[in-house]
Amino acid sequence: MNLTGGITWHWLAWRSQARWAPTSNAIENWLMQQAQAFKPEAVEGQPNLLLIGASAGWMMSSRWLGQFARVDTFDIDPFAGMLFKWRHGAALKAQGTELHCHTQDAMQNLPALLSKHPKACVFFDNVLGQVRFQHPANDWQVVEKKLQQLKVTLKGREWGSVHDRMSGPTLETIAEGSC
């Protein structure tokens, strides 16, 4: 059983939107600031985006996604694509952004995916922080090596990653920007 997918998980995410709003807004503000400073030299016109670990885009902003000519989402959850289209489809269409949702593990064949989309920007949404859970706790060197190799694989390409620091209540308030 995967606790980060399935209809129950999405129902809980939908019900938690108000509680997540400050985090979603902080992510949107950060992404929009990055967009202002970002102009990839290898891309003419509007760039395309590969959104890996998209889920239903619960923490993503339609405004930020709409700056891309085309958005391809990738998630292993079979409900993710349908719900992503429900959440962002109309807004992206109104902004002239093509949306293509894929049910697959993009991390398994990332080099081929990057070859297929040579000029696309890449954004990892709650994916890279989970790599450590795919290995025994004492294999931290393997995890570190995988993440270092990812930097090499993505060299020369615009890319980014976000992973929420806490998924649940905390004992103390965590100041925005302290991550």
Show the residue positions of the predicted features.
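Conserved SAM/SAH-binding beta-strand->alpha-helix loop
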Residues: 77
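S-adenosyl-L-methionine
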Residues: 85-116
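A short SAM/SAH-binding and catalytic strip from SAM-dependent methyltransferases
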Residues: 119-138
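Conserved SAM-binding loop of SAM-dependent methyltransferases across substrates and taxa
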Residues: 55-68
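Conserved class I S-adenosyl-L-methionine
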Residues: 44-57, 157-179
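A short glycine-rich, Lys/Arg-flanked "PGG" loop and its adjoining helix->strand segment in the class I
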Residues: 115-117, 137-159
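Class I SAM-dependent methyltransferase Rossmann-like catalytic core
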Residues: 1-44
